[in-house]
Amino acid sequence: MSSAVLLLLVCGCALAVLSPVAYGAPMDTDDRPVWDSIRLCDIPNEPNPGQCMLPAECVAYGKINDVSSLSSIERFSFIKQIQCNGSDTVPYVCCPRDSDAYREPYVNETMVPKNRVASRIAFDADSCGIQSYVAKIRGGQLAEIDEFPWMAMLLYERDNNALTQGCGGALISRTYVITAAHCVTGKNFQQTKGRLKFVRLREYNIHTNPDCVYENDLKDCSDDMIDLVPQAVIPHPEYDSESSNQQHDIALIRIEQTPPFTDFLRSICLPEQNFESSATPGKKLSVSGWGRTDIFKDNLGPDVLSPIKLKLSLPYVEREKCSKTFRPWSFALGPGQMCAGGERAKDTCAGDSGSPLMSYDMKRAIWYITGIVSLGVRGCGVEGLPGVYTNVHHYLPWIKMYTGA
């Protein structure tokens, strides 16, 4: 493998640059599990089961996967419901076995609004790390409409042009968002990314506002998205944008106080202990954001960020193994960095730079921010090459100096 493929990057818009081998190309048939060819699944409005397969191999899916579909509640809800658990490493969709087209590619529900009052009063008004989302059997990389309500999208403006999404972040209090330092500062930063204009909260689908989905005979709509003006941008004082290892890649953005928390807006908890001190190799972590995915690749292209909030599960990689992996390229893992990923076609292309790496405490039913998407390799999901994240626990004293939390 050439050194160019393995070159560590600091990505301004998303974690890594896709390569066909790593993320875009279908798996060779010989690499697939035997059950993959007979995995059956349900398709809305069709009496016969479909087959779980790669989006690029489903002719019917190619006919409905376009930008206009993402603006239609009925069509987008259909696309969400045909996600399936064909593989743990790449997105799959349920494809008709006896036709090259879906019979009725939309979900026409009764449009009765979902009542969310009960879930809103079940939690303390300011509690962190809690979400109303309940895991469903259906798989896929598209997040649910109320999943990870602390996610933030950073919007940039250059030369008075339209706003562009560039990085992610996470709400950690009513007035602070945490992100990567390289998302807010650095050499020639404004020339390459533009000026940080807004922090967007309560976003799910950038093509609609408010965002709605049909599920279980109900129409579920989020609160309107909100764009908040940054009051102060605080990169870590030791961050050096020209450093090859990008240590201290962490920043805080102070915003005006958010509206009251709801199912669609809540902060994530800061870690109470160092995740690495008790984690076992392979322990699952989660990442979310508006990164890259094969779900919309054929229509939007491989290098376009997703308009829909994504999610992905990643394995923790122990420090010694990660350091050994990058040693040939003279990359030294700093005390404030950690690693995750490194499985084939499974890395944080789904999450923008600055997005949170999250851990879930099952006993307390609380989400914690463990890391921040920082460094990646050329090609998301290159087997054996994990992504590098800023370890949030290492910077707690610095964070609390500003937030007071």
From Swiss-Prot:
Signal peptide extent: 1-24
Deletion phenotype: RNAi-mediated knockdown in female does not affect lifespan and basal melanization. Simultaneous RNAi-mediated knockdown of SRPN2 and CLIPB8 in female, reduces the spontaneous melanization and the lifespan shortening occurring in SRPN2 RNAi-mediated knockdown. RNAi-mediated knockdown severely reduces the melanization of injected Sephadex beads.
Entry's localization field: Secreted
EC number: 3.4.21.-
Limits of the Clip domain: 41-95
Keyword Protease in record: yes
GO cellular component: extracellular space
Stored InterPro entries: CLIP, CLIP_sf, Peptidase_S1_PA, Peptidase_S1_PA_chymotrypsin, Peptidase_S1A, Ser/Thr_Proteases_Immune/Dev, Trypsin_dom, TRYPSIN_HIS
Keyword tags: Disulfide bond, Glycoprotein, Hydrolase, Immunity, Innate immunity, Protease, Secreted, Serine protease, Signal, Zymogen
Gene3D superfamilies linked to this entry: 3.30.1640.30, Trypsin-like serine proteases
UniProt xrefs under SUPFAM superfamilies: Trypsin-like serine proteases
Site (Cleavage): residue numbering on this chain: 136-137
Domain text: The clip domain consists of 35-55 residues which are 'knitted' together usually by 3 conserved disulfide bonds forming a clip-like compact structure.
Protein name: CLIP domain-containing serine protease B8
Species whose genome carries this gene: Anopheles gambiae (African malaria mosquito)
